[in-house]
Amino acid sequence: MITFEYRFDIVPGKTAEYEKYLKGQGKNIWTKYKGVKAVRKYKSMLGGSSPQRVVQVDLDSLASLERILSDPGFKKAKEKFHSLVTHVTDSLLISV
């Protein structure tokens, strides 16, 4: 199993649009794909720290992640996501 983790901030002034995205195009963006085992979403408790949001996606394999990232529907949703967020970083994690 692997964990794909990404961290980001919402672009100032785009919070309402981001919340709308989560209820529409971004809703269940990960869980609808085969190979996804769990999704965890976090918001920082420390005001002013960056990044403010963290998402962790557990997948059964790297192949599943690659398949999801190459899906046209996912790519379209990801493009919209990136128009609403900044300071995006990601990691691929395995347990030790």
PLM regions with names:
Residues 1-2, 96:
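Absolute protein N-terminus
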Residues 23, 63, 93-94:
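Compositionally biased amphipathic helical and low-complexity segments enriched in hydrophobic
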Residues 14-41, 73-81:
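Short amphipathic alpha-helical segments
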Residues 2-9, 40-72:
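Short, well-ordered beta-strand segments in beta-rich or mixed alpha/beta enzyme
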Residues 37-54, 77-96:
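Glycine-rich beta-strand-turn "strand-cap" elements at beta-sheet edges
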